[in-house]
């Protein structure tokens, strides 16, 4: 049996942390305080269980998270033409590197439940990259269509997000890093990575198959290297490139 707790004002509560209950409205308030506003384009990386004890069913919880994001940037998932902002959520499919198959409708996201939920909503577009794909909805969704020959190259979705002034949000934690760092690594041509070609097929929204080849700037296994998220976070804070907010015991980071 599903149930939701209510606060004194009759608002259904979303999660509990440190003996305090929080609603969708609390999340909206934090995001707005962080500078997220109507018309923004946002890319949301999440670790939702970092928020605390969930007080709703999984689908109700995920729906409220998406609803909060929509509310902040001016998006109505049922009225795409009226949207003012854009929401972008990772739905990466690393399995393509082994299986050689990326099915835009059926390949499950391997990076969290929010993207897996979001990509199945009506009118949500899933990008073409067979490894680093995103679910996208909103005013600027059309800008992210098209195939890039390199996961992090000049035609990639990461470059497009930079060009379109997307704000990057880490929801639930700031300790897991952000995939954008790999775009920077390719841009700088760091010596501990190299291009590796992956071959396979993409099955699009209309079940049409096409062969593809994509370059992935992968780590050199014979060259010691380690991504230090604490160091990266330290630099971002020092350079005032990230703002960190708290909701319960969880952190919410905003860059851009």
Residue ranges: model-predicted function:
Residues 1-256:
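N-terminal and secondary-structure boundary signal
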């Amino acid at each position: 049996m599903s149930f939701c707790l209510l606060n004194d004002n009759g608002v259904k509560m979303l999660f509990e942390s440190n003996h305090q209950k929080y609603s969708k409205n609390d999340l909206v308030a934090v995001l707005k305080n962080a500078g997220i506003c109507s018309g923004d384009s946002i890319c949301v990386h999440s670790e939702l269980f970092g928020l605390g004890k969930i007080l709703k069913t999984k689908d109700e919880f995920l729906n409220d998270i998406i609803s909060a994001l929509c509310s902040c940037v001016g998006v109505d998932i049922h009225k795409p033409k009226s949207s003012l902002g854009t929401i972008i959520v990772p739905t990466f499919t690393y399995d393509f590197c082994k299986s050689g198959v990326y099915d835009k409708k059926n390949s499950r996201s391997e990076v969290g439940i929010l993207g897996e939920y979001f990509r199945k909503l009506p009118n949500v577009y899933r990008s073409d990259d067979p490894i680093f794909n995103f679910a996208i909805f909103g005013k600027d969704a059309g800008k992210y269509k098209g195939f890039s020959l390199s996961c992090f190259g000049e035609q990639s979705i990461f470059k497009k997000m930079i060009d379109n002034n997307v704000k990057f949000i880490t929801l639930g934690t700031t300790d897991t890093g952000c995939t954008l760092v790999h775009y920077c690594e390719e841009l700088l041509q760091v010596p501990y990575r190299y291009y590796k070609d992956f071959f396979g097929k993409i099955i699009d929204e209309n079940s049409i198959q096409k062969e593809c080849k994509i370059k992935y700037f992968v780590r050199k296994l014979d060259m010691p290297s380690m991504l230090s998220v604490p160091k990266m976070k330290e630099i971002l804070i020092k350079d005032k490139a990230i703002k960190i907010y708290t909701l319960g015991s969880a952190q919410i980071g905003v860059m851009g």
